[in-house]
Amino acid sequence: MKRVGDYILDKRIGWGAFAQVYKGFSIKTNEPFAIKVVDVCRLADKNSKLTENLNYEIRILKELSHTNIVRLYDVLNEETDPTFIYMIMECCEGGDFSKYIRTHKKLTEEKALYFMKQLANGLKFLRQKQIVHRDLKPQNLLLSDDSEHPILKIGDFGFAKFIDPFSLSDTFCGSPLYMAPEILHRKNYTVKADLWSVGIILYEMLVGEPAYNSGSVPDLLNQLQNKKIKLPSHISSDCQNLIYSLLQIDVEKRISWEDFFNHKWLNLNNNDSYKNNSGNYFNNNNINNNNNNNTNNNNNNISYPISINSNNTNNNNNNNNNNNNNNNNNNNNNNNNNNNNNNNNNNNYYNNNNSPPNVYHASSLPYDFNNNNNNNNSNNYNNNTNVPNSLPFAYNNNIYSSPTEAIPQPTTLNKSKSLENTGNTIRAHPFKDDKKSTTIQQPQQQQQQQQQQQQQQQQQQQQQQQQQQQNRQLSNLSTDFERDLVILDGEELESMERVFNRAVAIAELGDLRQNEPLECVPLYILALKLMKSKIPNDPSSSPDKFINTFTEYKRKLVHIFSTSNTSVKNQDHHSSFSPNRFIYENALEFGKKGAVEELYNNYPTSLQFYTDGTLLLEYLSSIVIDSDDQEIIKKYLNAFEVRTQICKKNYENSKNTVLNTNSIQNNT
């Protein structure tokens, strides 16, 4: 166990590429905490945007003290090794809300109302602070304990930010299945985007699955355009009215925050109480009006990990919404903050258990990342006196109203400016060489021909740039998908034929495991999902080979599923089997077999093993998110490619040798 200040780090309960979360406890009080350990140097080196998100998370959590919001109690760092910071956070033993929904399948309307009231009260507090969350989903809602009536708490503020209620943002963030349509379409959006996410969460509580479910952004956009959601008839009319009001694609028609808080079904304004985790009752109105001077004082000690002005660190003195119950609900949560920013991927980067000689409050860490941006606070762009002026990276991320020229328009988000369309003419970039005047005068006719050729070339370049822009946008959308979804788009899967080959390679692994239905079925499903992702709305336009293979493996899947015993229908009986791990292990095994065949000069067989292994690794490369995992798979792919090229070359040489030998023999 490792000691950090007055806290002991015990069991690791979550990890990611840049941070880990430990179960910990206070040496003085023995209270449990979740301690998030962040490698800020590695984080900044990898992506400056992630550094900003960490700053926002700490800045926002510092401002918040509420029953229905996960608390940040302290931020520490080691004096001798400032590489890491330690975020001392509230520990929630009940896990995340998605696990609760999966366990209970569909919630009763009464239980859904119980949780929705708590979510609404937490969001009402955020609205009072002018904070938009931007990544609301069940995985980011935590439960205080495993009791019948746990307290729901909003967590993971990595994407959250302070925002003017009427300002627009064009930052693309959040989880697509819970993301508002205006964000998916990369349009400017307001605080109403969170209301869509609330509607999807409420729908999932009552129905057991998200209103729109897809493995790719294009398909999700298609569903939003064509699919109409239907609610079970047993849901009350008031509840149905709220869901339909929240899930309005047109932002103007979507319910407002004020109307949401005052909605008849939620009934937040009455004095009805609902039970808490201890079996007691607490009033809805008390949630937002409890004061606790001790917790408020704790917040004043919390500072930012990365080069932040500390002039306004006492902004919390204006916070009159603190809660008395926070310290009474700190329990060990093996899932707490597991979905926090940068904590979604498996990474064994941290293994150092040495105790530091000294730990102190991180009032001014020795980092100077993006220092120029921190000076923007001197500008008087913000007309809203309620928004803190000390927010880090204030204007380079469009936090609130600033001069129009400082806000990048969404239409030029990924657009190259080397050629810009200005009406009927094409204006060259001012730094282009073609802007220079020529000293030799050409004949008029020759000049006209030359100008026409240049215009044609410029138009072609412009079309290519527009196509590249669309491809980049599509790729960016897909990479933001949740890790448990298969990421399939035109950038990653180069062609229908390549998808077909990858799917068949996975399906053939299933063929080898037909005697183990619990392993065969997941592999078939994976292969069918892969093929289906490339079948257009009109299947008749697909190659016969593609459709026939899809149909054949679907038939095999149904046959195995229907003829096997009931255990195959309950994956919990064989939960240790991981299709992706099985694919990874077999890819490496194919590499070994290919190498053996290559040693014996069996080049055709060796090439087949290398090809199958490459296809499996390409599939894994298309779904993996963790940077370390990506690097490992990339190295294997490069090694397979090298051996494949050598095998092909040796195979051609061996064939030529045989031909030459036969030719000599014939001549003699």
Swiss-Prot record:
Membrane topology per the entry is: Peripheral membrane protein
Which Gene3D superfamilies does the UniProt record give? Answer: Transferase(Phosphotransferase) domain 1
Listed Polar residues bias regions: 402-425
- InterPro entries named among the record's database cross-references: Atg1-like (IPR045269), Kinase-like_dom_sf (IPR011009), Prot_kinase_dom (IPR000719), Protein_kinase_ATP_BS (IPR017441), Ser/Thr_kinase_AS (IPR008271)
The role this protein plays is:
Serine/threonine protein kinase involved in autophagy. Involved in the control of autophagic vacuolar cell death. Required for normal survival when exposed to pathogenic bacteria S.typhimurium by promoting autophagic degradation of intracellular S.typhimurium.
What catalytic activity is recorded? L-seryl-[protein] + ATP = O-phospho-L-seryl-[protein] + ADP + H(+); L-threonyl-[protein] + ATP = O-phospho-L-threonyl-[protein] + ADP + H(+)
Q: Which residues act catalytically here?
A: 135
Put simply, this protein is called Serine/threonine-protein kinase atg1
Annotated organism of origin:
Dictyostelium discoideum (Social amoeba)
Q: Which UniProt keywords apply?
A: ATP-binding, Autophagy, Cytoplasm, Kinase, Membrane, Nucleotide-binding, Protein transport, Serine/threonine-protein kinase, Transferase, Transport
Q: What Enzyme Commission number(s) appear in the record? A: 2.7.11.1
**Region (Disordered), start-end ranges:** 281-389, 402-447
* Knocked-out gene: effects: Impaired survival when exposed to pathogenic bacteria S.typhimurium associated with the accumulation of S.typhimuriumin in large vacuoles which fail to undergo autophagy.
User: Compositional bias (Low complexity) spans?
Assistant: 281-354, 370-389
Q: What's one Pfam family here? A: Pkinase
Q: Which GO terms describe its cellular component?
A: Atg1/ULK1 kinase complex; autophagosome; cytoplasm; cytosol; phagophore assembly site; phagophore assembly site membrane
Where the record annotates domain Protein kinase, the positions are: 7-266
Segments traversing the membrane: none
* Listed PANTHER family: NON-SPECIFIC SERINE_THREONINE PROTEIN KINASE, SERINE/THREONINE-PROTEIN KINASE UNC-51-RELATED
Protein localization: Cytoplasm; Preautophagosomal structure membrane
> What's the chief localization of this chain?
cytoplasm
Question: In which domain of life is the source organism classified?
Answer: Eukaryota
Group of enzyme by EC = transferase
Q: How does it assemble?
A: Homodimer. Forms a ternary complex with ATG13 and ATG17.
Family per similarity comment: Belongs to the protein kinase superfamily. Ser/Thr protein kinase family. APG1/unc-51/ULK1 subfamily.
